[in-house]
């Protein structure tokens, strides 16, 4: 067995019974600075959001916990912000302290028979971790390539793509419980993972994720390809396994074609990704011709994108010709900032789409991003 330590992960002691120790940095470091009345728009992928009364950049677990606990003791509102890829912040900002999680580092115990048990700091950029996982021959994260945000956010939303969810790999999640003022570690079965849901999402202000431990098998061949569209792009049948690097390249190409890979020069990527979850409905609610995927509880998952498109809201739809927010020109499931959009522009667009789909199909779409200081 070998133990690998990457970056400044202060909660592991790399001197304990290690046969091999490596030190390196995953990805690049973004320079951020805190202060007073700091605009939050640059910290979100929608590029929307008013100022935080006070912004703290927490680069260590100690700094993160000290800031959160101090705010809680004083009764000051405190928002813990990850990569900003799944939030819509109101134009008035946040009247309190915003803590941007910027912790980093990774430790791994690897053995040929047991695979890799990998603990990653919450502030590590998710896609940088995916790149590293492929290099280390850890199987599974390749399907989740290109998803923006930080590792600590992935269990909250139980992020997923192309038939794979992060909850499949998670062994445990270490958190700070703000209600009980104590550290709590949850095993996978205690996380209540569901479709884009978890116990952490159910109580959004209670738990601060400190790190995530995941278990991976070893190899260069991917998990079986589950998603038909991806299998076609890979030139294989569903259920086949291919090189993990090939999966990543193809996933990135598919996501880029839908405007789902961040690009500062492409306004279609100024989004929160998929703005609505795919509805879970009874079989008799699925419109004729709509995709339908049976679930273990008897319900059916259908496509929010199909519903939006067939309700008359096509790519590039705006509520007005000069509106600065629109559906992506590449994919109707993303709401995008065309430049200068406010949170009000997004909530108006979202309400229009929700009401329209409900009027046509009787199905109410549910927004996926967390709403901070605004409502839909």
From Swiss-Prot:
<dbReference type="GO" id="GO:0005829">
    <property type="term" value="C:cytosol"/>
</dbReference>
<protein>
    <recommendedName>
        <fullName>UDP-N-acetylenolpyruvoylglucosamine reductase</fullName>
        <ecNumber>1.3.1.98</ecNumber>
    </recommendedName>
</protein>
<keyword id="KW-0133">Cell shape</keyword>
<keyword id="KW-0521">NADP</keyword>
<dbReference type="InterPro" id="IPR016167">
    <property type="entry name" value="FAD-bd_PCMH_sub1"/>
</dbReference>
<dbReference type="InterPro" id="IPR036318">
    <property type="entry name" value="FAD-bd_PCMH-like_sf"/>
</dbReference>
<keyword id="KW-0560">Oxidoreductase</keyword>
<dbReference type="GO" id="GO:0009252">
    <property type="term" value="P:peptidoglycan biosynthetic process"/>
</dbReference>
<keyword id="KW-0131">Cell cycle</keyword>
<keyword id="KW-0963">Cytoplasm</keyword>
<dbReference type="GO" id="GO:0071555">
    <property type="term" value="P:cell wall organization"/>
</dbReference>
<comment type="function">
    <text>Cell wall formation.</text>
</comment>
<keyword id="KW-0285">Flavoprotein</keyword>
<comment type="pathway">
    <text>Cell wall biogenesis; peptidoglycan biosynthesis.</text>
</comment>
<dbReference type="Pfam" id="PF02873">
    <property type="entry name" value="MurB_C"/>
</dbReference>
<dbReference type="InterPro" id="IPR011601">
    <property type="entry name" value="MurB_C"/>
</dbReference>
<dbReference type="InterPro" id="IPR003170">
    <property type="entry name" value="MurB"/>
</dbReference>
<keyword id="KW-0274">FAD</keyword>
<dbReference type="GO" id="GO:0008762">
    <property type="term" value="F:UDP-N-acetylmuramate dehydrogenase activity"/>
</dbReference>
<keyword id="KW-0573">Peptidoglycan synthesis</keyword>
<comment type="similarity">
    <text>Belongs to the MurB family.</text>
</comment>
<feature type="active site">
    <location>
        <position position="368"/>
    </location>
</feature>
<dbReference type="InterPro" id="IPR036635">
    <property type="entry name" value="MurB_C_sf"/>
</dbReference>
<dbReference type="GO" id="GO:0071949">
    <property type="term" value="F:FAD binding"/>
</dbReference>
<keyword id="KW-0961">Cell wall biogenesis/degradation</keyword>
<feature type="domain" description="FAD-binding PCMH-type">
    <location>
        <begin position="48"/>
        <end position="219"/>
    </location>
</feature>
<feature type="active site">
    <location>
        <position position="196"/>
    </location>
</feature>
<dbReference type="Pfam" id="PF01565">
    <property type="entry name" value="FAD_binding_4"/>
</dbReference>
<dbReference type="InterPro" id="IPR006094">
    <property type="entry name" value="Oxid_FAD_bind_N"/>
</dbReference>
<dbReference type="InterPro" id="IPR016166">
    <property type="entry name" value="FAD-bd_PCMH"/>
</dbReference>
<feature type="active site" description="Proton donor">
    <location>
        <position position="274"/>
    </location>
</feature>
<dbReference type="GO" id="GO:0051301">
    <property type="term" value="P:cell division"/>
</dbReference>
<keyword id="KW-0132">Cell division</keyword>
<dbReference type="InterPro" id="IPR016169">
    <property type="entry name" value="FAD-bd_PCMH_sub2"/>
</dbReference>
<dbReference type="GO" id="GO:0008360">
    <property type="term" value="P:regulation of cell shape"/>
</dbReference>
């Amino acid at each position: 067995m070998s133990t690998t330590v990457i970056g400044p992960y202060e909660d592991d002691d790399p001197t304990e019974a290690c046969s091999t120790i490596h030190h390196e940095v995953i990805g690049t470091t973004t320079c951020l600075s805190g202060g007073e009345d700091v605009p939050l728009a640059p910290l979100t992928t929608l590029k929307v959001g008013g100022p935080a009364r006070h912004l703290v950049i927490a680069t260590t677990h100690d700094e993160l916990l000290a800031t959160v606990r101090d705010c809680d003791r004083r009764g000051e509102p405190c928002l813990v912000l990850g990569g900003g890829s799944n939030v819509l912040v109101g134009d008035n900002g946040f009247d309190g302290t915003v803590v941007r999680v910027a912790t980093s580092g990774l430790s791994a115990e690897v053995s040929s028979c047991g695979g890799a048990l990998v603990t990653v700091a919450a502030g590590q950029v998710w896609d940088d971790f995916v790149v590293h996982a492929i290099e280390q021959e850890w199987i599974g994260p390749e399907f989740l390539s290109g998803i923006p945000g930080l590792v600590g956010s992935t269990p909250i939303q139980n992020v997923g793509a192309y038939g794979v969810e992060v909850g499949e790999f998670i062994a445990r999640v270490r958190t700070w419980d703000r209600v009980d003022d104590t550290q709590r570690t949850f095993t996978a079965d205690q996380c209540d993972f569901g479709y884009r849901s978890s116990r952490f999402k159910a109580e959004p202000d209670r738990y601060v994720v400190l790190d995530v431990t995941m278990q991976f098998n070893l190899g260069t061949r991917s998990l079986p390809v589950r998603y038909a569209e991806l299998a076609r792009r890979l030139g294989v049948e569903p259920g086949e396994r291919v090189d993990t690097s090939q999966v990543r390249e193809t996933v990135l190409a598919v996501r880029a074609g839908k405007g789902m890979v961040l690009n500062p020069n492409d306004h279609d990527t100024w989004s929160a990704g998929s703005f609505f979850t795919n509805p879970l409905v009874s079989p008799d609610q699925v419109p004729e011709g709509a995709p339908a995927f049976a679930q273990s509880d008897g319900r059916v998952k259908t496509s929010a994108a199909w519903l939006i498109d067939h309700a008359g809201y096509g790519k590039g739809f705006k509520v007005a010709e000069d509106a600065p927010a629109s559906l992506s020109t590449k994919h109707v499931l993303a709401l995008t900032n065309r430049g200068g959009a406010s949170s009000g522009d997004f909530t108006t667009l979202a309400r229009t789409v929700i009401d329209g789909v409900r009027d046509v199909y009787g199905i109410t779409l549910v927004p996926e991003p967390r709403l901070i200081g605004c409502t839909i």
